Amino acid sequence: MKKAIIVIIVAIIALIIILNSKNILKLIYKTNYSEYVEKYAQENDIDPLLIYAIIKAESNFNELAESNRGACGLMQLMDSTAREVATNTAIEYETGNTLYNPEKNIALGVKYFADLKSQLKYT
């Protein structure tokens, strides 16, 4: 009887976690840039949680992050990549501090990711 109660409690907890997984993940990831992530993820049909994960891995949510190779900002974009993405879209880009602008960085980074996804025909 005691074992059955424990199994039921564990099952209920697991069900709660599964049903609230997006909310739990949003608690784990900082969502300081949620306005931009949600907007550009939706525009490009990308799961916003994937974008949060990329930002976490690339810059740990530090908008001033810079790699030793020159990748900049939240999504760690190279100037050449950002320029290429911007020329194929309506996103304005100027070489310099643009990659440190969270909205521009996320807009360009999400679009770049969406383009890669499309090239690989991954849905």
Please tell me what each predicted stretch does:
Residues N60, G73-Q76, T98:
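Residue-level preference for alpha-helix termini and adjacent loops
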Residues F61-L64, A71, E84-A86, G109:
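Membrane-proximal soluble helical/coiled-coil segments
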Residues A4-N20:
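Hydrophobic membrane-insertion alpha-helices, especially the h-region
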Residues L15-L64, N68:
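Export/targeting segments at the very N-terminus of extracytoplasmic proteins
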Residues R69-M75, S80-A82:
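Early exported N-terminus immediately downstream of N-terminal targeting peptides
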Residues L49-Y52, C72, A107, K111:
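Active-site phosphate/pyrophosphate-handling residues
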Residues E35-E38, Q42, D79-T123:
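Alpha-helical segment that forms one wall of the substrate-binding/catalytic cleft
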